[in-house]
Swiss-Prot record:
The gene is S. Residues 2-163 are annotated as: Pre-S. GO terms for cellular component: membrane; viral envelope; virion membrane. The large envelope protein is synthesized with the pre-S region at the cytosolic side of the endoplasmic reticulum and, hence will be within the virion after budding. Therefore the pre-S region is not N-glycosylated. Later a post-translational translocation of N-terminal pre-S and TM1 domains occur in about 50% of proteins at the virion surface. These molecules change their topology by an unknown mechanism, resulting in exposure of pre-S region at virion surface. It comes from Hepatitis B virus genotype A1 subtype adw2 (isolate South Africa/84/2001) (HBV-A). Residues 79-103 are annotated as: Disordered. This is Large envelope protein. Residues 2-170, 264-337, 388-389 are virion surface.
Amino acid sequence: MGTNLSVPNPLGFFPDHQLDPAFGANSTNPDWDFNPIKDHWPQANQVGVGAFGPGHSPPHGGVLGWSPQAQGILTTVPTVPPTASTNRQSGRQPTPISPPLRDSHPQAMQWNSTALHQALQDPRVRGLYFPAGGSSSGTLNPVPNTASHISSISSRTGDPALNMENITSGFLGPLLVLQAGFFLLTRILTIPQSLDSWWTSLNFLGGSPVCLGQNSQYPTSNHSPTSCPPICPGYRWMCLRRFIIFLFILLLCLIFLLVLLDYQGMLPVCPLIPGSTTTSTGPCKTCTTPAQGNSMFPSCCCTKPTDGNCTCIPIPSSWAFAKYLWEWASVRFSWLSLLVPFVQWFVGLSPTVWLSVIWMMWYWGPSLYNIVSPFIPLLPIFFCLWVYI
């Protein structure tokens, strides 16, 4: 046993791996492995305890070597404490005892209460501790702080923390306004198309709108009259309808603004004098009739001056322009005055008015909604004008 040099053992996991020629074994140096506790071949057939537990490595040590730890033998070696240093000069020296105050600061011992009181009587010393008009009795006034504001700023150790709540609100406010404005803009741009569809649907009652330009000399594909391509003959009519719709929307906004300004009393229009069709706002020397009532704006002379005199009538604080239009229309069309008692009587019958409104909304509601729905995006704009003007 152990003399056959042809036993293959390239990895060295089996005992007597020093016999493998791959590891330099020969007849002159058969034992190049100096492992003192290596096992021979008969004992290699037994299950040994190695670094990985029973049966996982050969008895002679395994891949971790032949140390006691590789053989599964754990030995606890006590640690040796370091020796105490006997050289006291290498470490920190002890703090020496402070000498007495009379030895270290002899000049401080010469001041007693009597000497200090006498020194304070000197005007030069007194000026250092007491400001002008001060008293030596009681506590000493501190020296005023003459440090500049710049030095106080430079003495700070860091910048103050930023108020993130103010910064967030400052960013979210404009962002929400921008988002709401963009949403309203996209909705407003759909108004002309919706009104155009309603306008063209009046020509195709009971059927789907179809562009009539398809039967012309240059036919196009089937499309709606509200989305004609530029090559379609109906494209010019579509642009004309959109332009008229834009003018109508602009006129509607101006009317609403005019009504709002008139309600706020910002249109100082002189009312008409009953029985008179001529008015003048020229200069007047005196007024034959004093102005009555409280008004936001001053009174104006509304009758034609005679010898420099005129009749003064106060401008209404609200609905001045509407009253002027009503008086002007009543003078031009006398039959309008006959409608006033009927309107007052009808408005006074509140249950009847509400029942009539409910009946009309129930009967014409779907049709009115189809007509009014394109103008719904304008309601937020009207509301903002009403609130902020």
